[in-house]
Amino acid sequence: MNIPFVVETVLHDGLLKYKFKNSKIRSITTKPGKSKGAIFAYRSKKSMIGGRGVVLTSEEAIHENQDTFTHWTPNVYRYGTYADENRSYTKGHSENNLRQINTFFIDFDIHTEKETISASDILTTAIDLGFMPTLIIKSDKGYQAYFVLETPVYVTSKSEFKSVKAAKIISQNIREYFGKSLPVDLTCNHFGIARIPRTDNVEFFDPNYRYSFKEWQDWSFKQTDNKGFTRSSLTVLSGTEGKKQVDEPWFNLLLHETKFSGEKGLVGRNSVMFTLSLAYFSSGYSIETCEYNMFEFNNRLDQPLEEKEVIKIVRSAYSENYQGANREYITILCKAWVSSDLTSKDLFVRQGWFKFKKKRSERQRVHLSEWKEDLMAYISEKSDVYKPYLATTKKEIREVLGIPERTLDKLLKVLKANQEIFFKIKPGRNGGIQLASVKSLLLSIIKLKKEERESYIKALTASFNLERTFIQETLNKLAERPKTDPQLDLFSYDTG
């Protein structure tokens, strides 16, 4: 493993290439580069906990100490210094000193035998996510996965570190996503200290798996939108609009209006922002998400409020003194600022509620999606990375799952059409079915070395009568996601 290249991939040119003084590899004719940022490194977990470390400002200094450090800060700070005369205790690794955000990382902590996972489990979950980790490191009690950005996000103090706040939301959503199925430490610092890549701990590395901040942000917004809001034993009807206040038509009408002012007293800018914030609160969004969106809303206004006023309004909405935005008051706001002709039908969508469905054992009919869960679990249990498919019979599947014959046939066709499984049926007395999940096949390919992939893909193509391009294109989708719009200005300014 080329560890210097791994380090360079993570750091995104955030440090100098060569040491400013006493460089052993910089030529005499090459001038020292202009000062950039700094990171912190530690030679053991004990030293890290005690704060005993070193400040590094060049990649050369990292490479000189290859395999002697155990921890580092993969995100770059504006400066680093020491808190004592002996230069033993580091100082400066605080969020308000961040210079650039290079990567998100997740700490998978295994505390019991039941929680035992492998790097393959992380990759499998990542395939579902649609964003692959750039790097997976083995630690004493588990793993750490790095999701390195395509380009770094530069932090600016001018906007009260909005980029850090936005990145925190993304980082938390990534951790919560993986935490649904794997043992994730949800409490560790988002941009703090992590395991450093070494020759003895890198389990997986692919520099092609890097995505833009905008892509992560778009995904994160959807994740936040999907976070549920429960009410006793009731749930919102699937597909019903208006299930949350942020889904109501009035919310978008107010959110995209820009000509508010304070001259109308009770129905001015402050009231509109407070009402929008209440909608975020009642819909189950975090205060960080609401604050970020209210900053964006405020920036669009012809007469924006001061940022400290925005923070004050959001915190008031999240004080738990209110349940949500008042319907009557919403109507007044929309008529005052959007259009006086608006009616309740234009602004609100009636909600529908129903009780939780019975347990499967108590029902006469089982939904196809539930049979899908059973079948996918069965495939996963009977196959692994090294043999990602299983040979069996439809009869055996029916007996194991208790699924009716016609339902199984329909399920197989649906899953194949949705490109979730591959299967091949061999007729006759000695026939059967060869079955594999697309996810398992992709994972087995990802784990192979590049020179082995070609022959392996050919073998899979022959086994399942597949077009080779489908597997290759699917891999490419993971590695080469479509380019998105340029990043927002607030992420591109440097305070250095």
UniProtKB/Swiss-Prot annotation:
What name goes with this protein? Protein RepR
Source domain of life: Bacteria
DNA-binding span(s): 120-141
Q: Which InterPro entries match?
A: PriCT_1 (IPR014820)
Keyword line = DNA replication, DNA-binding, Plasmid
Extract one GO BP annotation from the record. Answer: DNA replication
In UniProt terms, what function does this protein have? Essential for replication.
The GO terms describing molecular function are: DNA binding
